Swiss-Prot record:
Family: Belongs to the CidA/LrgA family. LrgA subfamily.
Pfam families xrefs: LrgA
GO BP, one annotated term: cytolysis
Entry's localization field: Cell membrane
The protein's name: Antiholin-like protein LrgA
Amino acid sequence: MKQQKDASKPAHFFHQVIVIALVLFVSKIIESFMPIPMPASVIGLVLLFVLLCTGAVKLGEVEKVGTTLTNNIGLLFVPAGISVVNSLGVISQAPFLIIGLIIVSTILLLICTGYVTQIIMKVTSRSKGDKVTKKIKIEEAQAHD
């Protein structure tokens, strides 16, 4: 009797690396055809999200590698820090402008995040409220029968 492969069983680590590498490779190809500049890593994140949502890629096929990468994310930011050090000449020319830009962009990010969160909360509370209202109406209709 043949054993069927369990779909919920996590894939081997090497298989997970290959899946993520293929997604990144496809995103690099997509990046080369895009009319606007967009990092392949961002395209890859969106592509992987779509693949996970559609079920084309199962969570078990990327979970272990994703967790490992997330746990070591500080190490992955070292190249970005080194490139900032290489740009100290540019930063030293207009430090107040750069600090101001950082402050303004942080405030705008917080405001936008707050508004988006409020919109999502309103939409989800309406849908939950509609379900509760329908349930109450059904119970009232059954009580009158």
